[in-house]
UniProtKB/Swiss-Prot annotation:
Similarity remark: Belongs to the eukaryotic ribosomal protein eL8 family.
Organism of provenance: Staphylococcus aureus (strain NCTC 8325 / PS 47)
Top-level taxon of origin: Bacteria
Pfam family membership, one: Ribosomal_L7Ae
Span of the signal peptide: none
InterPro entries on file: Ribosomal_eL30-like_sf, Ribosomal_eL8/eL30/eS12/Gad45, RNA_bf_YbxF-like
Name used for this protein in its record: RNA-binding protein SAOUHSC_00526
GO molecular function term, any single one: RNA binding
Keywords, ordered alphabetically: RNA-binding
Amino acid sequence: MSKEKVARFNKQHFVVGLKETLKALKKDQVTSLIIAEDVEVYLMTRVLSQINQKNIPVSFFKSKHALGKHVGINVNATIVALIK
């Protein structure tokens, strides 16, 4: 993904993309995650290991394309992190 965004999502802030999600996890800002169902598992290993330690809830979205469109970007989104 070429640009990461911070925007409003159902009155919550969120970040889009793997790099931004990892940054938010490192800062303990993540309240929950939305992961596209068609994402390659090896891309999510670092994220999944961190969220298991922090008990962060995870939801799944039907596809990367649909997730990107739902959050208002014109590219695929593998992951969206809702932040504090």
